[in-house]
């Protein structure tokens, strides 16, 4: 399915809205080149992520190269008549740091990963994140939180979850990690300090360590819930 529309390079309101709202992303001397290309989403993508596919089909799409890196700008009008959207980064598979589950790779092949979002729903999964899904930024395990987690488990006399093979595919600005376990594809949030309404503690684990999202079990559930949050927010 072709979703790309030709954009006027000197009159792209969507990109100007992004530039104004995410002013820190572009440098004063950033080299910006708009491309006239077509975005194709596969039948497999549409079957795996029907809600996300519907959202993408409603988007205004701009293909842009920023400082020699390729991006797609997806833009919509929200219920308050503001332009909102995602700047998605496109990467070659050899830039990925970790082996991913097939659904994650499928998503990246079709639309890339979210580098920035703007004017988003207040409680959406994209809010306040450093990246979402981007292959080159994913990592295994909980990283610098290992000592904190060990201490919390020792204090609460809980058995540690072995998360060394979990893949973190979202990194929040406050350090929280959204991860999946590759075999089961189940999604978890590791957060030391959260104020989310959509998560719950895991039984037999210390509070403010591993959590589960309400209404989300697997990676595909997470993607579709993210899409649904935006579908309800746009016109």
Predicted segments, located by residue:
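Short linear sequence elements within intrinsically disordered, low-complexity coil regions
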Residues: 23, 76, 109, 185, ...
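Short, surface-exposed loop and linker segments with low hydrophobicity and enrichment for Pro/Ser/Thr
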Residues: 158-162, 179-184
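A surface-exposed partner-binding patch
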Residues: 2-174, 235
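A recognition module on extended beta-rich or small alphabeta surfaces enriched in W/G with H and D/E
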Residues: 170-183, 190-230
